[in-house]
Amino acid sequence: MDAAHWHQGLGLVKPMEEMLMGANPNPNGSSNQPPPPPSSAASAQRPIAPPAAGAAAGAGAAGAGAGTERRARPQKEKALNCPRCNSTNTKFCYYNNYSLQQPRYFCKTCRRYWTEGGSLRNVPVGGGSRKNKRSSSSVVPSAAASASTSAAVSGSVPVGLAAKNPKLMHEGAQDLNLAFPHHHGRALQPPEFTAFPSLESSSVCNPGGNLAAANGAGGRGSVGAFSAMELLRSTGCYVPLPQMAPLGMPAEYAAAGFHLGEFRMPPPPQQQQQQQAQTVLGFSLDTHGAGAGGGSGVFGACSAGLQESAAGRLLFPFEDLKPVVSAAAGDANSGGDHQYDHGKNQGGGGGVIGGHEAPGFWNSSMIGNGSSNGGGGGGSW
């Protein structure tokens, strides 16, 4: 026996139906009357559709809904050909469009963008054209720099630069050798120093041709590159200097006993014609020779050897002033050279050479404590 019917089996609990019937003995007296059964006329007026027709109508409605759903979805677009390489490996750019009226496409083959209804853009991915523009722009200044350096090396100013800045032609701004500036545009001007040849001329060793080229109308024709080192190396070149004004010996010096050859008057013109050789200092050194009288000149004995040589060396105070013996005067001065060397080793004053004192020692003549016979003395300079 089931547990739900224990009370009913014992008779303790009445069934629910009996309890309800006992509470309401008139079943029709309740306010909630059941609805009347449908009449036959109503059933005749309302036809009942067959179940097969209803199933067909439901299937048609579901098919119409699916068709509208398919039409709403965009059809898969056909791949467009690239206008550059005519490749079909293209794609539509969803997130990189400029406007919806002109959709943007990208070609994976040539890596170019183009817009529908617009022009093809020659801009590759990664900015390659920008790099090309930078390289092309950097080529222009490099070409200009190379042109300027070549113009500077050749030593000529470009026409455009000369027209913009005419000072370049006059001041020689392109010249890198500042020690010897070029004299551009000074051919018509009178030379400032007529006796000094141009240091830039290639004919420095030819004084006559050099002066003619420097002072003539075509002075720039012989101008060449001549550096300071070449000037120092050319010891054999003959560079004349302007004539120095003759200085007479003051009377007070002669009265005091100073026999300075430098203050004596120059020799007469007849003697100058015989002594045509000119030293590197520009004035004749033969004025202090043996025929000039007493006293010793520093460059007196040097003139005998220098008048025979066509090209002498620049004489400075620190050089050895030993006279150069020529072939003609070798016999006359052979004894003097020996005395000169002996006096130089002894450290005394000048020795007597052919009637006059040997050069190279100024201490006896300048100080006055020496004699013409070579007595007394100090260290030679």
Swiss-Prot record:
Domain of life: Eukaryota
Biased composition annotated in UniProt, kind: Low complexity: 23-32, 40-59
Cellular component terms (Gene Ontology): nucleus
Cellular localization per UniProt: Nucleus
Residue ranges of the region described as Disordered: 19-81, 329-349
GO molecular function, one term: zinc ion binding
Family matches, as PROSITE patterns: ZF_DOF_1 (PS01361), ZF_DOF_2 (PS50884)
Zn-finger segments (Dof-type): 80-134
Biased composition (Basic and acidic residues): 68-79
Keywords: DNA-binding, Metal-binding, Nucleus, Transcription, Transcription regulation, Zinc, Zinc-finger
Pfam families noted in UniProt: Zn_ribbon_Dof
Biological role stated in the UniProt entry: Transcription factor that may transactivate seed storage protein genes in developing seeds.
Protein name, per record: Dof zinc finger protein 2
Source organism (scientific name): Oryza sativa subsp. japonica
Taxonomic path: Eukaryota, Viridiplantae, Streptophyta, Embryophyta, Tracheophyta
Name of the gene this protein is made from: DOF2
